[in-house]
Amino acid sequence: MPGDVGEETLEIGAVVGKRYKVVQKLGEGGCGSVFKVEDTSEKGQHYALKVEFKSQDAGNILKMEVQILSQLISKKHVAKCVASGKKERYSYMVMTLLGESLDSLLKKHGPFLNVSTQVRIGICILFGIKQVHDIGYLHRDLKPANVAMGCKGSADERYFLVLDFGLARQYIADEDDGLKMRRPREKTYFRGTARYCSVAMHDRYEQGRVDDLWALVYILAEMRCRLAWHDVDDKVEIGEMKRKIHDEVLFAKSPVQMLSFVKTVRSTLFYHRPDYEKLFKLLEDVMKCANYKWSDPYHWEPEKKKNPASQGNKFGLGKKGTKESGELPEASFFTVDDFNTNPLGF
């Protein structure tokens, strides 16, 4: 019967939370399933429904997601949790419906993207990372599959949002004399995805804010050049390859500013607050030098007439350079103020 919940799925037509009707299954993983649902109380309004079945023993991953999204509710450019609850056989969360993931876009339109797209996505991810860090959490599993565009027609349709906080961990503790960073454990279990995690995670050290930035480093590199360990499965071997690779090789097809970007990340220690503002300015400098605009079409969008004066040949990018701006506002989506605030004070 519609509405019955099996061990692995919900039927099309099932109603969750007395108002969210399942209309399409979007995906499935070891931690549950994702569905597109329609709000029966608001015609035409759709959301994403995440369901975590108790039979799958996912370890309350959904509970962590609800907790983080609830704390991010007042932040901009983040998915919103609009409802959550528990049933006898599953837990659920209703959240903002997003567009395609970066992973999907790379597979469909890649394997590589142009620099204008690379740096804009990089800025969006950097902002998303900072939003999570500012409420006292680490993501710990940043990868292209966990970054997605806003849904078409929404205010965030031109932004890329960070999502999937199931492996997140709080890095602050409320002690007698105020909020403090938690002391790192000597050794930890592996958390994350081997292709994108930091070398420190390969060594099973406690992850800090800087480790999320290392994931961004590898995502940025992969948007322009195949990672040397792309086809390697062994975690130890991947860790050794990351240790040995030179920055100039990692970012061989990227603007020179990326070398300063990775150098800045490398100089950041566990207890250090990352210099988000400096990292933002490095990516923004790429845009300024090549006259890239936030209104430019993304790599997979129809190209407008090229403007010869704004081609990317300053970086040796070949024929695929800057695209002429479309009809979107020319103003930057972000400002320095988005990256220099420090609500935690450390």
UniProtKB/Swiss-Prot annotation:
Q: Where is the Protein kinase domain?
A: 20-287
Q: Which Pfam families match?
A: Pkinase
Enzyme Commission code? 2.7.11.1
SUPFAM superfamilies xrefs: Protein kinase-like (PK-like)
State the Gene Ontology terms under molecular function: ATP binding; protein serine kinase activity; protein serine/threonine kinase activity
UniProt keyword terms in alphabetical order = ATP-binding, Kinase, Nucleotide-binding, Serine/threonine-protein kinase, Transferase
Give the start-end ranges of region Disordered: 302-326
What biological-process GO terms show up in the record? signal transduction
Secretion signal: which residues? Answer: none
Q: Which residues form the active site?
A: D141 (proton acceptor)
TM ranges = none
Q: Please give the InterPro entries that the UniProt record associates with this protein.
A: CK1_Ser-Thr_kinase, Kinase-like_dom_sf, Prot_kinase_dom, TTBK_Asator-like_STKc
Where is ATP bound in this sequence? L26, G27, E28, G29, G30, C31, G32, S33, V34, K50
**Catalytic activity, reaction form:** L-seryl-[protein] + ATP = O-phospho-L-seryl-[protein] + ADP + H(+); L-threonyl-[protein] + ATP = O-phospho-L-threonyl-[protein] + ADP + H(+)
Q: Which GO terms describe its cellular component?
A: cytoplasm; nucleus
**What does the sequence similarity comment in the record state about its family?**
Belongs to the protein kinase superfamily. Ser/Thr protein kinase family.
Can you name this protein?
A: Putative serine/threonine-protein kinase K06H7.1
Protein's organism? Caenorhabditis elegans
